[in-house]
Amino acid sequence: MSVPTVLEKILARKAEEIAARRAVVSLAELEQQVANADAPRGFANALINQVRLKQPAVIAEIKKASPSKGVIRENFLPGEIARSYQAGGATCLSVLTDVDFFQGSDAYLQEARAACNLPVIRKDFMIDPYQVVEARALGADCILLIVSALDDVQMAELAAVAKGVGLDVLVEVHDGDELERALKTLDTKLVGVNNRNLHTFEVSLETTLDLLPRIPRDRTVITESGIFNRADVELMEINDVYSFLVGEAFMRAEQPGAELQRLFFPERKPAAGGPAVD
């Protein structure tokens, strides 16, 4: 019997978590919350509009921990971090809500969204329509669909539910096979390329560059993982990739928003009164 991978463990735990949540809050109750929720902020449009200007469209991540790195940020105040990111020039936010493996929380998403006016993606392992409706009820503007965690039928179903409740979809791929499946199954405008190898956990920006020619020009490509310095940013920009999802580089900085500005907008003066998060 083979040993389960980290992803398999996460997905098994996620199924248990969803069952427990359903027992507390029904799908019908979530749908009622969605009916009373604020209008979505337009996650995809915010990125697309920035990319059209050939300006960095940064999805700044709010992440406390990960299975591979452990705790990344001890002093973790999602609202302050969100304000710091907005002051630093972020286009959107990504908030981890997985509890068991990333020490995330639904409350972190709500705190971050309430603290700024940026669109927010719920970063979690989405495997059930219940989670999609739940994401909208929490105030998310977009969900993440990870191709390696889903079959094509699941992907299509989750995307349809997202569309029905007004959420954008960012589909995440790691290799050519996953990209082919995503393009065949989904019409989302947002294609995220995760530069982290799921088997070795090594990170290479070449993953984005290798897949780029295979992605239709009408899709917006988001490069994920491995952006740590100006050279990384410039490498992407000279290849016409202007959207970035960055977490760890910001989370390890004393002032996440200032680090965002240093990496992506070095020509700007520091934001006046931008909150220090230390």
UniProtKB/Swiss-Prot annotation:
- Enzymatic reactions: 1-(2-carboxyphenylamino)-1-deoxy-D-ribulose 5-phosphate + H(+) = (1S,2R)-1-C-(indol-3-yl)glycerol 3-phosphate + CO2 + H2O
Question: Which top class of enzyme applies to this chain?
Answer: lyase
What molecular functions are annotated in GO for this chain? indole-3-glycerol-phosphate synthase activity; phosphoribosylanthranilate isomerase activity
Name of one Pfam family that matches: IGPS
Report the InterPro entries cross-referenced here: Aldolase_TIM (IPR013785), Indole-3-glycerol_P_synth (IPR045186), Indole-3-glycerol_P_synth_dom (IPR013798), Indole-3-GlycerolPSynthase_CS (IPR001468), RibuloseP-bd_barrel (IPR011060)
Lineage: superkingdom: Bacteria
Give the keywords, sorted. Answer: Amino-acid biosynthesis, Aromatic amino acid biosynthesis, Decarboxylase, Lyase, Tryptophan biosynthesis
Gene3D superfamilies under this entry?
Aldolase class I (3.20.20.70)
Instruction: Give the record's pathway.
Output: Amino-acid biosynthesis; L-tryptophan biosynthesis; L-tryptophan from chorismate: step 4/5
Q: Name one GO biological process term.
A: L-tryptophan biosynthetic process
Q: Which EC numbers characterise this protein's activity in its record? A: 4.1.1.48
Query: Among its keywords, does the record have Lyase?
Result: yes
Family statement drawn from the similarity comment of this UniProt entry: Belongs to the TrpC family.
- Give the HAMAP family listed for this entry: IGPS_B
Check the record and name the PANTHER family matching this protein.
INDOLE-3-GLYCEROL-PHOSPHATE SYNTHASE, TRYPTOPHAN BIOSYNTHESIS PROTEIN
Q: What is this protein called?
A: Indole-3-glycerol phosphate synthase
Task: Recall the taxonomic lineage recorded for the source organism.
Answer: Bacteria, Pseudomonadati, Pseudomonadota, Gammaproteobacteria, Pseudomonadales
